[in-house]
């Protein structure tokens, strides 16, 4: 049976991990075993945080909408309920952007909902 030499394959596998570990601090970037652990942890965190980002941005938008709504004399829940009843379909991202960039337009939305 022929001898199987795996030097190239093993080096490619290690280099792939070490390339992913670029920018890490200390031995985490150039010692394979610790780099491998750090890369696996980083990939787990990235997977988790891709899902968490959606929640975090929604929370941010809601906070911004609530702050602007309170300036205009109402609160978030009344504003959203009024918009739903008035068939105004603007998502929270757009509403938060309006509240920051165009307060007069946001004020008109609040006044139309309050009626």
UniProtKB/Swiss-Prot annotation:
GO terms for cellular component: ribonucleoprotein complex; ribosome. The keyword RNA-binding applies. This is Large ribosomal subunit protein bL20. NCBIfam families: rplT_bact. InterPro entries: Ribosomal_bL20, RIBOSOMAL_L20_CS, Ribosomal_protein_bL20_C. The keyword RNA-binding applies. PROSITE patterns: RIBOSOMAL_L20. Belongs to the bacterial ribosomal protein bL20 family. CDD domains: Ribosomal_L20. The gene is rplT. It comes from the Bacteria. One of its GO terms (molecular function) is rRNA binding. It comes from Prochlorococcus marinus (strain AS9601). Binds directly to 23S ribosomal RNA and is necessary for the in vitro assembly process of the 50S ribosomal subunit. It is not involved in the protein synthesizing functions of that subunit. Keywords: Ribonucleoprotein, Ribosomal protein, RNA-binding, rRNA-binding. GO terms for biological process: ribosomal large subunit assembly; translation.
